[in-house]
Curated annotation (Swiss-Prot):
A motif (SH2-binding) lies at residues 159-162, 235-238. Zn(2+) 3 binds at residues 150, 155, 169, 209. Zn(2+) 1 binds at residues 5, 10, 24, 64. Residues 98-109 have a biased composition (Basic and acidic residues). Zn(2+) 2 binds at residues 27, 42-43, 59. Residues 70-113, 311-346 are annotated as: Disordered. GO terms for biological process: centrosome duplication. InterPro entries: CHORD_dom, CHRD1, CS_dom, HSP20-like_chaperone. It comes from Sus scrofa. Interacts with beta-1 integrin subunit. This interaction is regulated by divalent cations, and it occurs only in absence of calcium. This is Integrin beta-1-binding protein 2.
């Protein structure tokens, strides 16, 4: 007789006669959802991708369990979805459009850099790219302009002619890491609190200069939302973390993304609603970049951009042509659809 295992993260059918002490790989903890990140309280892995969260492998081995487990008490620490619901005041009435307009912060507030979360699949793709081709290889010197800067992170060399190729390039082949205020490069691990000191860190590898010119690219992009979150997605192959930045204020978004091949996507968006900058973040994956903006007030946005900004862009003939908002009401829209990403992340 085949029974269904109710251990979290398992869900397999098993034969009680062959149920061994190490037959089941599961999560003994509870789901944790905090600042758009999803994970289990029993292990450290976190992701913004809902289907990747569902596929996080169990961290504990034991026998299968055919009985439904009682609900465990919520752990202290990061807020879970249940605890957030408990804290929500009863009968909360959404603010009217007039109230939101009146309470909208001034647009001249300085933007802040959003933290970049680099997926394991992208790290593997960047490592493979580093093995396949050295920076600057195959670039036609006749196309390089005098005064061009080396594009490798950590190198400040300027092209003065063919003799510049003979000088060594000291650079960082890895990606920048920002965690709990500390800043470092994944390739050398020297940590610092000061952003200026981080930028001035000398490279840890010697190679060839990359004089490639970055080209503005027209990338496919769209957005979707839940009651508490707006996700802007820009599609492109192999975003380069060292050159990417996304800034946001409560009402504006500034995007600068560099993909493989020196293709650059840039956009400035005056947001329809107000966001919580401190809780927002950016996730880099092999085939796209997801910008997760946490709404300051729950509710649905009629569109991504503010009507005033759309009117101004319409007059000037310039606009950010976002694909239609796709999501309805679930974080399922954050799921990965590319089979190659799933294979790389395993």
């Amino acid at each position: 007789m085949s029974l269904l295992c109710h251990n979290k993260g398992c869900g397999q059918h098993f034969d009680p006669q062959t149920n061994l002490p190490d037959s089941c790989c599961h999560h003994p903890g509870v789901p944790v959802f905090h600042d758009a990140l999803k994970g289990w309280s029993c292990c450290r892995k976190r992701t913004v991708d809902f289907s990747e969260f569902l596929n996080i492998k169990g961290c504990t081995v034991g026998p299968h369990c055919a009985e439904k487990l009682p609900e465990a008490p919520q752990p202290e620490g990061p807020a879970t979805s249940s605890s957030l619901l408990e804290q929500k005041p009863p009968n909360t009435i959404p603010k009217s459009a007039e109230t939101l307009r009146r309470e909208r912060p001034k647009s001249d507030l300085p933007p802040k850099l959003l933290p970049l979360n680099i997926s394991q699949a992208l790290e593997m793709a960047l490592e493979q790219k580093e093995l396949d081709q050295e920076p600057g290889a195959g670039l036609d010197s006749s196309l390089i302009q005098t005064g061009a800067s080396c594009q490798n992170p950590g190198c400040d060399a300027v092209y003065q002619g063919s003799e510049s190729d003979a000088t060594p390039c000291t650079y960082h082949p890895g990606a920048p890491r920002f965690h709990e205020g500390m800043k470092s490069w994944s390739c050398c691990g020297i940590q610092t609190l000061d952003f200026g000191v981080f930028l001035a860190q000398p490279g840890c590898r010697v190679g060839r200069h990359d004089w490639g010119k970055k080209l503005l690219a027209s990338c496919r992009h769209d957005w979707h939302q839940t009651d508490s979150l707006v996700v802007v997605t820009v599609y492109g192959q192999i975003p380069l973390p060292a050159f990417n930045w996304v800034e946001a204020s409560q009402t504006e978004l500034h995007i600068h993304i560099v993909f493989d091949g020196n293709r650059v996507f840039q956009a400035q968006v005056k947001l329809w609603g107000v966001v919580n900058v401190e809780q927002s973040s950016v996730s880099l994956m092999p085939s796209r970049v997801e910008i997760s903006l946490v709404k300051a007030d729950p509710g649905f946005w009629a569109q991504l951009e503010h009507p005033d900004a759309l009117a101004e862009k319409s007059k000037s003939g310039v606009g950010l042509e976002m694909d239609e908002e796709e999501s309805e009401d679930s974080d399922d829209d954050l799921s990965w659809t590319e089979e190659e990403e799933e294979a790389m992340g395993e």
